[in-house]
């Protein structure tokens, strides 16, 4: 199990910080895990699952 910091999540998803937090507020992106008083991270597996779901949505729209 690996925890990703915000920059790594941004690199994996090609999304900006504000977009990631917008999707979190809309319950369409995995919620971060508190790591300390001013630090959060995301489970790599949850971010990867989110990416795979976007791919599945794309593929379903072409079917």
Question: Where would I find each of the regions flagged by the language model?
Answer:
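Polyanion-binding surface elements
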Residues: 1-19, 23, 46, 52-54
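Short Lys/Arg-enriched helix C-cap and helix-to-coil transition segments
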Residues: 33-38
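C-terminal structural segments of small proteins and small subunits
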Residues: 39, 43-62
């Amino acid at each position: 199990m690996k925890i990703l910091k915000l920059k790594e999540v941004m690199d994996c998803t090609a999304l900006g910080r504000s977009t990631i937090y917008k999707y979190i507020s809309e319950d369409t992106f995995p919620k971060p895990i508190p790591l300390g008083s001013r630090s959060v991270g995301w489970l790599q597996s949850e971010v990867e699952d989110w990416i795979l779901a976007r791919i599945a949505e794309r593929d379903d729209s072409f079917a």
